[in-house]
C-alpha cells in the first residue's frame, strides 16, 4: 500500500480546503448535536449515525489524499460518498426544521458537509482526463499538470525522467579494417589473431569481433537493461501505454492487462508480459495485485 505523506495534502489546495471545510462542518454538527440532545427533547437518534458516518468519511478521504490513491479506489470512494450524501441529507431534514437553535446549527453543519461531499463526488467520479480535474490538479505540487494529459492517458513524465538503466556505457567495438592501421601493436590476449608474435596475424582479421557484432553492440545494445530472472509481483494496467519508439527498453501494454513485475521500488518497473516480452513500465500506470 502507498505510504501516507502529509505533503500530498499540504501541497494540494483542493485537498487541504475540502478536508478543512469538512472538519469544520463535522465539528459544528457534532457540538450542536450534543447541545441539542441535552437541552431539547426528542433529538433524532438517527442523526448520531450521520455524525459518525461523516467522521469516517473525513478520515477515509484524508487517507486517500495523503496516499494519492484516488485514481485507484475512485469507484469505491464515490460509492461511500453517495451513501454519506443520503445520510447527511436525511440528517438535515430531521434537524433544520426544529425550533431550537442547536438543532438548526447541527442541520447547518450537515448541509455544509453535504456540499463538500457533492464536490468530492464530482471530482472522484470523473476520469483523470476530465478537464475540470486536470485544472484542479494543476494547483497541486505532487500531481500532473493539465499539460501532462494526452491521448487518453497521463504522461509518465509526471513521475520524473526514467533513471539510467546501465551502470556504464558499452565500449565502442572496432575491427582492424575500420581502424585502418591505428590499432595498437601491443599483444592483447583472449582475442582472435593468434598469440603475440604469431606470423599468422593478419590486419584484415577482426581483433574485436566481426563487423556485424561490433555494430550491433555499438548501436543496438548499449542501453539494454539486464533482464531479471524472477518476477515475484503481479500488476494490472490501469491505463494503456505506448512505448517510446526511441527507447528500446520500454514496453507497451493495454488497459487491464496483467504484467509480471520483478521490482517495485522505483518509479519505472521491470515487467514481463504474458507473451514473454520484457521491458520497463511507468509505475503510475500499474497497480499491484
From Swiss-Prot:
Side Cytoplasmic, residues: 1-13, 67-71, 126-289
Keyword Transmembrane: yes
UniProt KW keywords: Cell membrane, Membrane, SH3 domain, Stress response, Transmembrane, Transmembrane helix
GO cellular component, one term: plasma membrane
Record-linked InterPro entries: SH3-like_dom_sf, SH3_domain, Sho1_SH3
Domain SH3: residue ranges: 230-289
Composition skew (Polar residues), residue ranges: 199-226
Membrane topology of this protein: Multi-pass membrane protein
Any one Pfam family match given in the protein's UniProt record, by short name: SH3_1
Primary location: membrane
Keyword Cell membrane recorded: yes
Compartments reported by the entry: Cell membrane
Region (Disordered): 150-169, 185-229
Transmembrane parts of this sequence: 14-34, 46-66, 72-92, 105-125
Source species, domain of life: Eukaryota
Topological domains, Extracellular: 35-45, 93-104
Job description of the protein: Plasma membrane osmosensor that activates the high osmolarity glycerol (HOG) MAPK signaling pathway in response to high osmolarity.
Subunit structure: Forms homooligomers.
Family per record: Belongs to the SHO1 family.
Protein name (database record): High osmolarity signaling protein sho1
Organism: Aspergillus oryzae (strain ATCC 42149 / RIB 40) (Yellow koji mold)
Gene (UniProt): sho1
